[in-house]
Amino acid sequence: MAAPTYYTITFGCQMNRADTERMAGILESLGYVATEDELQADLVLYNTCTIRDNAEQKVYSYLGIQAQRKRKNPAIKLIVAGCVAQQEGEKLLRRVPELDLVMGPQYVNRLGDLLAQVEAGNQVVATDPVEIPEDITKPRRDSQVTAWINVIYGCNERCTYCIVPRVRGQEQSRQPQAIRAEIEDVARAGYREVTLLGQNIDAYGRDLDPKTNLASLLRFVHSVEGIERIRFATSHPRYFTEELITTCAELPKVCEHFHIPFQAGSNEVLKRMRRGYTHERYRQIIQLIRQYMPEAAISADAIVGFPGETEAQFQETLQLVQDIGFDQVNTAAYSPRPGTPAAEWPDQVPEEEKSDRLQRLNRLVAEVAAARSARLLGQVQEVLVEGPNPKNPRQAMGRTRGNRLVFFEGDPEELQGSLVPVRITATRAFSLTGEAVTVRASGP
């Protein structure tokens, strides 16, 4: 008898992608086998995101197709996980009665138990707040070179535009020993890089007893043999301390790339967003980073068209992008999320104005990023090879310590997992092309 098959699709952030990897690992421990054909899979799992309305609508579109399959073949298992599941709960069952399981992000490690309830004939909704348990099941990781490691779940912030605290719950930090054990495990499996993940990763440890912090965690895991690079995301400016910056500068494995969302360049907008910092404080953080690590790459997130944002306030965002010189900015037009204060405010910015501002911001981001990339022309950059260039299989693809994508001629299979010095011969806003100088052998 053939093993049952499963198919997953992930919407949203790195946290969701890491959660999907963990759920895939649980499914495989239960005997399921991955398939690329969602219309033939015995179990279909959508890991969802509520940050943008378009992502939510895509989920319902996919669910409509799967619901038709389920009506013809009731044995198919249909699961919605993640933030839409947490937000909608039983409403999802009323909208899509064919669903077997609706589970919030806090239940990722409990998927096996929830499936057992489904197998017993139950339709299950798991959205009540729970403590997130450690899970000994190994994730089915998408990459063979770089691994995501969750270190803190949830968020205690109360930004007026954001639904995340409602759907992901309060902060729950993992114990340092458990995090190090997982990193040691991926190192033994041949991984060369880890990215420590959290909604506000620099808030790590304040809920533990005894309290600790991200700087201490970085020092604790830095000595794991086999790991060549350590990254972390996403950081909140409120908790990005000088101690954290100096620790990153001192530890050679920590990459000189920091993702720190600023969201807006206007203090008035930041205040209404309830972000808890000013643009002056944000600039001070970047200045400190570049004081200790002059070549550090900085990426961020920004929102345009927040309720009440004037053209003059938007110009402050453009000025911040110009002044900082970001390597990348993930931009978005404000999207009202049900249940958030900002969604109820009367001074919503018209859609056409949001679209215009987004286009102008994107043009500037590309210009600034292109100038940052151009500085690397002729330099030799250390590139961790992740695999082949999807558009040209004769080229290897990897990332610099500053997280720039690099393409160069070479055997991707042979070089995968290797740290290769590459001389940069051409630059674009968000990627580089180069030539291998020498090859440093892969790890043991």
Swiss-Prot record:
EC number(s) recorded for this UniProt protein: 2.8.4.3
Chain residues that bind [4Fe-4S] cluster 2: C155, C159, C162
Ligand binding ([4Fe-4S] cluster 1): C13, C49, C83
Ranges where the MTTase N-terminal domain occurs: 4-120
Catalytically driven reaction(s): N(6)-dimethylallyladenosine(37) in tRNA + (sulfur carrier)-SH + AH2 + 2 S-adenosyl-L-methionine = 2-methylsulfanyl-N(6)-dimethylallyladenosine(37) in tRNA + (sulfur carrier)-H + 5'-deoxyadenosine + L-methionine + A + S-adenosyl-L-homocysteine + 2 H(+)
GO MF annotation list: 4 iron, 4 sulfur cluster binding; metal ion binding; methylthiotransferase activity
UniProt superkingdom: Bacteria
Co-factor binding comment: Binds 2 [4Fe-4S] clusters. One cluster is coordinated with 3 cysteines and an exchangeable S-adenosyl-L-methionine.
Subcellular location: Cytoplasm
Cofactor(s) listed: [4Fe-4S] cluster
Domain TRAM: 374-438
Radical SAM core domain ranges (all copies): 141-372
GO aspect biological process, one term: tRNA methylthiolation
Pfam families: Radical_SAM, TRAM, UPF0004
Keyword entries, A-Z: 4Fe-4S, Cytoplasm, Iron, Iron-sulfur, Metal-binding, S-adenosyl-L-methionine, Transferase, tRNA processing
Gene Ontology CC annotations of this record: cytoplasm
Role: Catalyzes the methylthiolation of N6-(dimethylallyl)adenosine (i(6)A), leading to the formation of 2-methylthio-N6-(dimethylallyl)adenosine (ms(2)i(6)A) at position 37 in tRNAs that read codons beginning with uridine.
Subunit structure: Monomer.
NCBIfam families: miaB-methiolase, MiaB/RimO family radical SAM methylthiotransferase
Family statement drawn from the similarity comment of this UniProt entry: Belongs to the methylthiotransferase family. MiaB subfamily.
HAMAP family recorded: tRNA_metthiotr_MiaB (MF_01864)
Protein name, entry field: tRNA-2-methylthio-N(6)-dimethylallyladenosine synthase
